[in-house]
Amino acid sequence: MAALDSLSLFTSLGLSEQKARETLKNSALSAQLREAATQAQQTLGSTIDKATGILLYGLASRLRDTRRLSFLVSYIASKKIHTEPQLSAALEYVRSHPLDPIDTVDFERECGVGVIVTPEQIEEAVEAAINRHRPQLLVERYHFNMGLLMGEARAVLKWADGKMIKNEVDMQVLHLLGPKLEADLEKKFKVAKARLEETDRRTAKDVVENGETADQTLSLMEQLRGEALKFHKPGENYKTPGYVVTPHTMNLLKQHLEITGGQVRTRFPPEPNGILHIGHAKAINFNFGYAKANNGICFLRFDDTNPEKEEAKFFTAICDMVAWLGYTPYKVTYASDYFDQLYAWAVELIRRGLAYVCHQRGEELKGHNTLPSPWRDRPMEESLLLFEAMRKGKFSEGEATLRMKLVMEDGKMDPVAYRVKYTPHHRTGDKWCIYPTYDYTHCLCDSIEHITHSLCTKEFQARRSSYFWLCNALDVYCPVQWEYGRLNLHYAVVSKRKILQLVATGAVRDWDDPRLFTLTALRRRGFPPEAINNFCARVGVTVAQTTMEPHLLEACVRDVLNDTAPRAMAVLESLRVIITNFPAAKSLDIQVPNFPADETKGFHQVPFAPIVFIERTDFKEEPEPGFKRLAWGQPVGLRHTGYVIELQHVVKGPSGCVESLEVTCRRADAGEKPKAFIHWVSQPLMCEVRLYERLFQHKNPEDPTEVPGGFLSDLNLASLHVVDAALVDCSVALAKPFDKFQFERLGYFSVDPDSHQGKLVFNRTVTLKEDPGKV
């Protein structure tokens, strides 16, 4: 049908010309609306009135199952369905009853077919609603929420026409209140402002009590409760767009509900061939968080189907990271737990003519739109014998595979289900020499564990068709796969292969090098798990891929550490200072608050002796304008001591380098307040401090247009600076690995596992927020 004819048809249905043109841009909607209109005209034998046309548009735009189009059009054309509430009920009914035949008696009862709502009934329902709210209505007049009255009337008269209810409400309110006065036309500023202020107070209180981030971002749990509205309820998988319904579906879902009791079940299924990274933190939060938000359970399932690349250290590290982020799996499972069942199902696929043994080499299978395998139509009995021979080790690696008979969404034909590998498995030993692929294993393991929501990243969308196909081909419970966007960071690589290259070339020490964005690296650097979870909450769950700046993650880290990391003082590049008139014979004990903003969190004690050490940068013989720290004629305060020091003599070595300073001190309250107070240490511990910068110079080190030489050419050679002889106050003497501190004026630091008795090692986690007043 020509576009002009379609435009004329759509406007004749009651659509505005603009709406009709917008509809024409959507080919699927246009085709469905044309078909609905054609069928309606055949039923009516005449033109379609506007009311019927609008319902047909609503049907065409909202109906997912096109098999039901004719059925519903017949009800609309015959006026058995003639209101929007009836259409909504009809669409919900066919969505909830995906199998034929439809029970028309039950359908008509659920959709209000034949129910007549008289004007008198509408009048009575509206009058009753107005009487319930009369006092408030008389006070607020036309500022009252009239939608409340319409909602209450509609609740009583489910099948009443909404327009008729609105007209009746308008008429009765006008009769009660009379015409609008000038005050009724004014905007409701004061009331709105009062409500907004109350909302702000409640929100602020919630943020404090729930420990959320300072910008009052919704927690991921709260977001997932919202996302839950978009997901199907357990057992209602068929309501998900694109879900494939077979004659066995409803019975399988019934059995599924009997097993799970309607419980939400998710899973986090990592491959144990590498360390988890920041993107996995989002997946962990999403899967565990969604289950928790809905009182469900989450499995930790290792996809251990590739024994060549799996190592015990990766299993341990993954379990540790899940626990570190604060989550406890309902059960830790392995794909290898189900190898026997997976093999039995593979045999069944062959018996059903849906899989075959193929001898094409790997390079022949690569790419899309490849030619069909010459072995695709080999006899089922032959494939059974050959698959058994594969299991018994009678083929070399790459000599035979088992392939499934389907074409995936991305055009890939007949994905491999099993391949030969003569590598012993870490759990099953040498029992198997054939191993299932991800495409074969993933959906069937989800089915075995009765997962309700299989949440995975967007790159698996092309595998959704094979996911549904395989479960349905075997007539087993089919979960719903839902894809979301990956989380990436600028100035980072997270690919396992590329991290291995970084380790192999010595660019980083290992998977937990603090310059990486693996979770073990972030933990070693000192990032608190709460900060990572808060960061995931800020990013949220979207379908689009998200690439974030590292400073946003660092802001979350500061928010947490500001409240949890006790203060200490450390000096990185020290300068010796001798106080010539020290006010005590030996030393003084200084009480320093662990958290200066909240002294109820306690104090720690540090010595203050005649010799102290300050940062070399806190002294200048010839200061530039605006320099506020120690200089000739410019005293400076020592934090927490109550004393001010003033320069008397500069001691230099043979090369002219300043070796020490001699100063005098006075009470801070005994004279003019100094321009600045600096940190210091006395009788300190020597320690090693590692200062980290970005590992890469460009935002997208893997982008060949930005970094033509490849990511290894983009390394920042100054990404690590080690201070071997830093000094720190004695309050940290008993610190353990991963303990965290704020070194005053320097940043947040964490104790590294390389620490040993006699020398602590600190990693700088993040710097402090920039102080514009510091010079």
From Swiss-Prot:
L-glutamine binds at residues 303, 438. Highly expressed in fetal cerebral cortex, particularly in the ventricular zone, inner subventricular zone, outer subventricular zone, and cortical plate. One of its GO terms (cellular component) is cytoplasm. Changing residue 403 to W: In MSCCA; results in loss of glutaminyl-tRNA aminoacylation activity; impairs protein folding; does not interact with RARS1; results in reduced protein solubility. Its EC number is 6.1.1.18. The keyword Phosphoprotein applies. The modification N-acetylalanine is found at residue 2. One of its GO terms (biological process) is negative regulation of apoptotic signaling pathway. Changing residue 175 to A: Decreases catalytic efficiency about 60-fold. It is an enzyme of class 6 (ligase). The modification N6-acetyllysine is found at residue 309. Changing residue 515 to W: In MSCCA; results in loss of glutaminyl-tRNA aminoacylation activity; impairs protein folding; results in reduced protein solubility. A motif ('KMSKS' region) lies at residues 493-497. Its main location: cytoplasm. ATP binds at residues 271-273, 277-283, 457, 486-487, 494-496. Keywords: Acetylation, Aminoacyl-tRNA synthetase, ATP-binding, Cytoplasm, Disease variant, Epilepsy, Ligase, Nucleotide-binding, Phosphoprotein, Primary microcephaly, Protein biosynthesis. Monomer. Part of a multisubunit complex that groups tRNA ligases for Arg (RARS1), Asp (DARS1), Gln (QARS1), Ile (IARS1), Leu (LARS1), Lys (KARS1), Met (MARS1) the bifunctional ligase for Glu and Pro (EPRS1) and the auxiliary subunits AIMP1/p43, AIMP2/p38 and EEF1E1/p18. Interacts with RARS1. Part of a complex composed of RARS1, QARS1 and AIMP1. Belongs to the class-I aminoacyl-tRNA synthetase family. It is linked to Microcephaly, progressive, with seizures and cerebral and cerebellar atrophy: A severe, autosomal recessive, neurodevelopmental and neurodegenerative disorder characterized by progressive microcephaly, severe seizures in infancy, atrophy of the cerebral cortex and cerebellar vermis, and mild atrophy of the cerebellar hemispheres, resulting in profoundly delayed development and hypotonia. Glutamine--tRNA ligase. Plays a critical role in brain development. This is Glutamine--tRNA ligase. It comes from Homo sapiens. The gene is QARS1.
